[in-house]
C-alpha cells in the first residue's frame, strides 16, 4: 500500500501580494509556502504510514525552486518526492494541471490498495477543482471534504463534511481523497527529518518523461491547453473598522447611531 500526496507551492498571502502591471501575480517576488490544505493531506498520508507502514510519495508541479518545498515535506516524514517541471507545463489552469498531475501519478503507479491525497483547494485559486479532476482522469472513486479517515481492510470509512452536517462514506481503494483542515493537525519537521531529507530520493518528471502518457498532448497542457483565462489579480481594499455595541441598551445605542447618520 502506498500513499501519493499532491501538493502545491502557493504565494504567502499573509504578506504583501505583488501584482504585475498586466494584472497577474508576480510570484517571483513573493514569499511562498506549502498550500495549507495540502499539509492536512500529507498528515493524513503520514498517519496511514504510521498505521500500515506504507510509503508516502509527495508530488508537485512547479518551477525548479519548488524542490525546496518538497525537501521540507520529506523532512516532515514523506519517503519520496517528485517534481513535475518543464516549460511546456507553464501557464496551466486547473484543467491542464490535472492532466499533467494525473499523468505523473500514472507514472508513479497506483496499486489496488493505494490512496491519492489532495488538499481541498489552493489558497491562490480557491477552485477546489484539481483533486476531483485528477480522480476523473484516473478513473478513481473520490471523496471530497474529508474530515476523518478510518482504514477497514481494502476500503476506507470516510467522514465527509457537508454544509449542514456530515456524511459517512465507505470507499474502496484505490481512491482519491481531498482533505480539509478539520481532518488533523499537521506535524512539524523533526530534527532527524531535517538532517535526512536530502538523503531521500527526489525525481524530476519533465515533458519528455510524461509525453507518452495519453493525457499529455500539446493541446491539453500549458497555456495553450488551458480554457481558463485570468485577466486580473488584485488585493481587495481593506474594510473600515466596525463598531461593537455592548450592554443591555444596544438597541438604544444603535438607534442613536442611525439617527446621527439621518438613517432613521
Regions found by a protein language model. Give the residues of each.
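N-terminal glycine-rich FAD/FM-binding segment characteristic of electron-transfer flavoproteins
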Residues: 1-264
